[in-house]
Amino acid sequence: MKTGIVSAVLALVMPVCVYATTLRLSTDIDLLVLDGKKVSSSLLRGADSIELDNGPHQIVFRIEKNIRLSNHEQRLYISPPLVVSFNTQKISQVNFNLPRLENEQESEAFEAAPRIELLDGDAMPIPVKLDILALTKTPKGTDYEADTERYNKAGKSASLPGFATMMADDSTLLSGVSELDVIPPQSQTLTEQRLKFWFQQADPETRTRFLQWAKQQPSS
Protein backbone atom coordinates (compact mmCIF):
# COMPACT_ATOMS: atom_id res chain seq x y z
CA MET A 1 0.00 0.00 0.00
CA LYS A 2 2.88 2.39 0.71
CA THR A 3 4.09 2.04 -2.90
CA GLY A 4 0.57 2.81 -4.06
CA ILE A 5 0.52 5.96 -1.93
CA VAL A 6 3.73 7.18 -3.55
CA SER A 7 2.31 6.53 -7.03
CA ALA A 8 -0.77 8.50 -6.10
CA VAL A 9 1.27 11.42 -4.82
CA LEU A 10 3.38 11.43 -8.00
CA ALA A 11 0.27 11.41 -10.13
CA LEU A 12 -1.34 14.25 -8.22
CA VAL A 13 1.70 16.49 -7.83
CA MET A 14 1.64 17.24 -11.53
CA PRO A 15 -1.22 18.87 -13.46
CA VAL A 16 -3.18 16.41 -15.57
CA CYS A 17 -3.84 17.18 -19.24
CA VAL A 18 -5.27 15.31 -22.18
CA TYR A 19 -1.83 14.34 -23.38
CA ALA A 20 0.77 12.40 -21.43
CA THR A 21 4.49 12.16 -22.06
CA THR A 22 6.84 9.31 -21.26
CA LEU A 23 10.32 10.40 -20.17
CA ARG A 24 12.65 7.52 -20.95
CA LEU A 25 15.43 7.20 -18.39
CA SER A 26 19.01 6.36 -19.31
CA THR A 27 21.26 4.16 -17.18
CA ASP A 28 23.86 6.95 -17.35
CA ILE A 29 21.47 9.53 -15.89
CA ASP A 30 21.08 10.22 -12.16
CA LEU A 31 17.85 12.20 -11.91
CA LEU A 32 17.99 14.58 -8.94
CA VAL A 33 15.08 17.01 -9.25
CA LEU A 34 11.92 16.94 -11.34
CA ASP A 35 9.80 20.08 -11.68
CA GLY A 36 11.19 21.55 -8.46
CA LYS A 37 10.86 18.34 -6.42
CA LYS A 38 13.68 16.14 -5.20
CA VAL A 39 13.41 12.68 -6.73
CA SER A 40 14.59 9.80 -4.57
CA SER A 41 16.79 7.16 -6.13
CA SER A 42 14.80 4.50 -4.30
CA LEU A 43 11.66 5.70 -6.05
CA LEU A 44 13.29 5.27 -9.47
CA ARG A 45 15.05 2.00 -8.74
CA GLY A 46 14.21 -0.43 -11.52
CA ALA A 47 12.14 2.12 -13.48
CA ASP A 48 12.98 2.79 -17.11
CA SER A 49 10.58 5.71 -17.59
CA ILE A 50 8.47 8.36 -15.86
CA GLU A 51 5.05 9.59 -16.96
CA LEU A 52 4.77 13.38 -17.23
CA ASP A 53 1.89 15.67 -18.02
CA ASN A 54 1.89 17.59 -21.28
CA GLY A 55 3.52 20.98 -20.80
CA PRO A 56 6.67 22.68 -19.44
CA HIS A 57 9.09 20.63 -17.37
CA GLN A 58 12.47 21.00 -15.73
CA ILE A 59 14.89 18.27 -14.73
CA VAL A 60 18.13 18.42 -12.79
CA PHE A 61 20.45 15.47 -13.29
CA ARG A 62 24.02 14.26 -13.43
CA ILE A 63 25.67 11.98 -15.94
CA GLU A 64 27.47 9.10 -14.27
CA LYS A 65 29.52 6.89 -16.54
CA ASN A 66 32.71 4.83 -16.46
CA ILE A 67 35.43 6.31 -18.67
CA ARG A 68 38.84 5.02 -19.75
CA LEU A 69 41.98 6.63 -18.38
CA SER A 70 45.25 7.01 -20.25
CA ASN A 71 46.69 4.02 -18.36
CA HIS A 72 43.75 1.91 -19.63
CA GLU A 73 42.13 1.80 -16.21
CA GLN A 74 38.58 3.00 -15.62
CA ARG A 75 37.03 5.50 -13.26
CA LEU A 76 33.53 6.77 -12.68
CA TYR A 77 32.94 10.17 -14.26
CA ILE A 78 30.27 12.28 -12.56
CA SER A 79 29.23 15.45 -14.33
CA PRO A 80 28.19 18.66 -12.60
CA PRO A 81 24.43 18.87 -12.00
CA LEU A 82 22.72 20.03 -15.18
CA VAL A 83 19.43 21.92 -15.46
CA VAL A 84 17.33 21.25 -18.54
CA SER A 85 14.01 22.96 -19.26
CA PHE A 86 11.74 21.82 -22.08
CA ASN A 87 8.11 21.63 -23.16
CA THR A 88 6.32 18.39 -23.96
CA GLN A 89 3.27 19.92 -25.62
CA LYS A 90 1.86 17.27 -28.00
CA ILE A 91 4.98 15.13 -27.46
CA SER A 92 4.35 11.55 -26.37
CA GLN A 93 7.93 10.48 -25.64
CA VAL A 94 11.19 12.12 -24.56
CA ASN A 95 14.56 10.37 -24.90
CA PHE A 96 18.00 11.46 -23.71
CA ASN A 97 20.67 11.72 -26.40
CA LEU A 98 24.00 12.12 -24.63
CA PRO A 99 27.30 13.03 -26.28
CA ARG A 100 30.08 10.48 -26.46
CA LEU A 101 31.83 10.22 -23.08
CA GLU A 102 34.38 7.43 -23.19
CA ASN A 103 37.66 8.97 -22.02
CA GLU A 104 39.19 11.83 -20.03
CA GLN A 105 39.49 14.12 -23.04
CA GLU A 106 35.81 13.80 -23.88
CA SER A 107 34.73 14.26 -20.27
CA GLU A 108 36.89 17.38 -19.91
CA ALA A 109 35.40 18.81 -23.11
CA PHE A 110 31.93 18.13 -21.75
CA GLU A 111 32.79 19.85 -18.44
CA ALA A 112 33.90 22.93 -20.37
CA ALA A 113 30.81 23.04 -22.59
CA PRO A 114 28.02 20.66 -21.54
CA ARG A 115 25.59 19.66 -24.24
CA ILE A 116 22.78 17.15 -24.40
CA GLU A 117 19.81 16.55 -26.66
CA LEU A 118 16.27 15.49 -25.94
CA LEU A 119 14.57 13.64 -28.78
CA ASP A 120 10.92 12.86 -29.31
CA GLY A 121 9.54 9.48 -30.33
CA ASP A 122 10.45 10.17 -33.96
CA ALA A 123 14.06 11.03 -33.00
CA MET A 124 13.43 14.71 -33.70
CA PRO A 125 15.16 17.25 -31.39
CA ILE A 126 13.07 18.89 -28.69
CA PRO A 127 14.01 22.53 -27.94
CA VAL A 128 15.79 22.69 -24.59
CA LYS A 129 17.44 25.24 -22.33
CA LEU A 130 20.56 23.88 -20.64
CA ASP A 131 22.60 25.23 -17.76
CA ILE A 132 24.79 24.09 -14.88
CA LEU A 133 23.25 24.20 -11.41
CA ALA A 134 25.38 26.07 -8.89
CA LEU A 135 25.51 24.20 -5.59
CA THR A 136 25.55 25.66 -2.09
CA LYS A 137 27.47 23.64 0.48
CA THR A 138 25.86 23.38 3.90
CA PRO A 139 26.76 21.46 7.07
CA LYS A 140 24.01 18.99 6.14
CA GLY A 141 25.42 18.47 2.65
CA THR A 142 23.98 19.35 -0.74
CA ASP A 143 20.29 20.21 -1.02
CA TYR A 144 19.54 19.95 -4.74
CA GLU A 145 15.92 20.97 -4.26
CA ALA A 146 16.82 24.19 -2.43
CA ASP A 147 19.54 24.99 -4.98
CA THR A 148 17.03 24.45 -7.79
CA GLU A 149 14.59 26.80 -6.09
CA ARG A 150 17.29 29.49 -5.84
CA TYR A 151 18.19 28.90 -9.49
CA ASN A 152 14.60 29.28 -10.67
CA LYS A 153 14.10 32.47 -8.66
CA ALA A 154 17.30 33.97 -10.10
CA GLY A 155 15.99 34.17 -13.66
CA LYS A 156 18.78 32.10 -15.20
CA SER A 157 18.79 30.78 -18.77
CA ALA A 158 16.96 27.54 -17.90
CA SER A 159 14.90 28.92 -15.00
CA LEU A 160 11.19 28.14 -14.65
CA PRO A 161 10.00 30.46 -11.85
CA GLY A 162 6.64 28.70 -11.58
CA PHE A 163 8.30 25.59 -10.21
CA ALA A 164 10.11 27.65 -7.56
CA THR A 165 6.78 29.00 -6.31
CA MET A 166 5.14 25.58 -6.35
CA MET A 167 8.02 24.06 -4.44
CA ALA A 168 8.01 26.77 -1.78
CA ASP A 169 4.27 26.42 -1.21
CA ASP A 170 4.46 22.65 -1.00
CA SER A 171 7.43 22.71 1.35
CA THR A 172 5.52 24.98 3.72
CA LEU A 173 2.51 22.70 3.63
CA LEU A 174 4.57 19.59 4.19
CA SER A 175 6.68 21.06 7.00
CA GLY A 176 9.73 21.17 4.74
CA VAL A 177 9.53 17.52 3.71
CA SER A 178 9.13 17.22 -0.05
CA GLU A 179 11.24 14.26 -1.10
CA LEU A 180 9.10 11.93 -3.16
CA ASP A 181 9.97 8.64 -1.57
CA VAL A 182 8.43 5.67 0.18
CA ILE A 183 7.23 7.09 3.47
CA PRO A 184 7.85 5.10 6.67
CA PRO A 185 4.90 4.02 8.85
CA GLN A 186 5.54 6.66 11.50
CA SER A 187 4.90 9.38 8.90
CA GLN A 188 1.43 8.28 7.84
CA THR A 189 -0.04 11.58 9.07
CA LEU A 190 2.19 13.42 6.62
CA THR A 191 1.12 11.04 3.87
CA GLU A 192 -2.53 11.73 4.60
CA GLN A 193 -1.83 15.46 4.60
CA ARG A 194 -0.19 15.26 1.19
CA LEU A 195 -2.99 13.22 -0.33
CA LYS A 196 -5.72 15.49 1.01
CA PHE A 197 -3.97 18.63 -0.21
CA TRP A 198 -3.31 17.38 -3.74
CA PHE A 199 -6.79 15.85 -3.95
CA GLN A 200 -8.25 19.28 -3.23
CA GLN A 201 -6.05 20.86 -5.90
CA ALA A 202 -7.11 18.38 -8.58
CA ASP A 203 -9.92 18.96 -11.08
CA PRO A 204 -13.09 16.81 -10.84
CA GLU A 205 -11.97 14.45 -13.61
CA THR A 206 -8.65 13.79 -11.88
CA ARG A 207 -10.41 13.23 -8.54
CA THR A 208 -12.72 10.66 -10.13
CA ARG A 209 -9.80 8.77 -11.70
CA PHE A 210 -7.93 8.79 -8.39
CA LEU A 211 -10.91 7.45 -6.45
CA GLN A 212 -11.38 4.68 -9.00
CA TRP A 213 -7.69 3.81 -8.68
CA ALA A 214 -7.83 3.87 -4.87
CA LYS A 215 -10.75 1.42 -4.80
CA GLN A 216 -8.64 -1.09 -6.73
CA GLN A 217 -5.75 -1.00 -4.25
CA PRO A 218 -5.31 -3.64 -1.51
CA SER A 219 -6.13 -2.46 2.00
CA SER A 220 -2.64 -3.26 3.32
From Swiss-Prot:
Pfam families: DUF2057. HAMAP family: UPF0319. NCBIfam families: CrliSynInhib, PRK03641.1. This is UPF0319 protein Ent638_1476. It comes from Enterobacter sp. (strain 638). Residues 1-20 form the signal peptide. The lineage of its organism: Bacteria, Pseudomonadati, Pseudomonadota, Gammaproteobacteria, Enterobacterales. PANTHER family: UPF0319 PROTEIN YCCT. Belongs to the UPF0319 family. Keywords: Signal.
